[in-house]
Every structure is written in structure tokens, then in C-alpha cells.
Amino acid sequence: MSRFILLAALGYICSQAPALAQVTPFAGALGGVATLSADARSLPTSHGLNVSLYKPANGPTLNFIAGVHLNQYLSVQASYGWNRNDLTLSSSSSGSNSFYVEQRSSSQRAVLFDLLVYFRKRDERLRPYLSVGTGVVHFASTRQNQIALNGTPTLPQTRFSSTQPALRVAVGIDVAVTHRLALRYSFGETVRHNDISAQLSPPGERILANFQNLVGFVVRF
């Protein structure tokens, strides 16, 4: 439903573009909290039950943006984002009495391009928006501490990483402080291939979702 509304709004705004065109560049910086999705899987076997899971902790995130307001309602932006999250991975096999628990660090670096659709004109003090974008995200994780180990479980690699395409959707609002300066709040979700789940044994099946609560400032030029 939200996608339909976004597409309908975009179609209307694009039809009005010639009358509204007035390109204005902007840039900004935002920071906040990143929350990763978790995953778990259980797999029955002839010898018992194999279980694996990972639990992420909330971590810091930074986002730097630059773009242009194409008209009163439509903007495009490029962004570079970083976030760090600690992880706890574990796996157990009742048949072989093997298990492990380990702590890991993880980080993501993203380059994304977004289309923003505003619902109020540029001279309004409150300007809510929806956005959708795509790009690439580099994920990396390193083992920090082996908490428990018994038997011969299949362990994740000491370090693993990959660069994958990603999709991001977000909602937010710009609150004008001055004519050129605005406070921006944004809540977004970025999804990509899940390298963490792929390292579990048995492997998890969920995609990796990165939820970000961001607040910062945007300056018009």
C-alpha cells in the first residue's frame, strides 16, 4: 500500500515538475542508532536437533548526505553511511553434543542514492517525506571472543566480508530552523544479503535488515 501511495504521489509531482522547477543543492550530516535484524534456525536430523542463531546489539551510525531539491516536492540525494554493531553467534547439535558461543564485531559501509518525495513546499516549516533508494553496502565481521566451545562444531570464519547491492526505504521530516538550515529526523530500513546467517550452521534464511534512527542538520546552498 505504501509503495502504491509513493508511486502515485511521484507521478503527480513529476507531472507538475515544469511549473515547480527550481534546483537547490543541499548537504548534511546525521547520527543515531542502528539496529540489525536477528535470525535463527532449527533443523531436525536423524540424530537429534541442530540449532543456530545470532543476536545483534544496537550500535552507532553516521550518515553524510549531499543532493539537490529538484522542485518544491522532489529531491535526489547521495549518501555515505557507516554503522557498527556487536554480534553474538551460537550453534548447538544435540546429536554430537557440539556447541559454540562467540562474540563478534561487525560494520557496514554504504553508498546509496535516494529519491525523496516531500508533502509540503520548501517554504513550509515542517516538511515530511518518503524516500526510496539503492546502492551498495560493504559488510565485515571479525571474531572477538570465543565464550564457549565443545566438541567439533562448524565455526564461522574468523573474518568474513562482502559487498552487495542494497535497497533502502525511509520516512522522515525536515524542520526549518532558519531559511537555509533544517533539522532532519529519519527512520530507514536498508536490506541486503545476510552474510551473518550464511555463516551459521545450519544456515539462517533471513535477509539482513538494518534499521536506522537518524537525526542531524541539512543546509541549503
Predicted segments with their positions:
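Cleavable N-terminal export/targeting peptides
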Residues: M1-V23
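Short sequence motifs at beta-strands and strand-loop junctions characteristic
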Residues: Y54-P60, S105-A110, R159-A166, E205-A209
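Predominantly the C-terminal beta-signal and adjacent terminal strand-loop region
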Residues: N85-L89, T178-F221
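Surface-exposed strand-loop-strand hairpins of Gram-negative outer-membrane beta-barrel proteins
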Residues: A34-L62, S162
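Residue-level recognition of beta-strand termini and adjacent short loop/turns
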Residues: N71, A176-T178
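Gram-negative (and chloroplast) outer-membrane scaffold detector with strong preference
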Residues: Q22-F26, G31-S37, I65-L149, L208-F221
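Extracellular loop and loop/strand-boundary signature of outer-membrane beta-barrel proteins
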Residues: H47-L53, S96-R104, T152-R159, Q199-E205
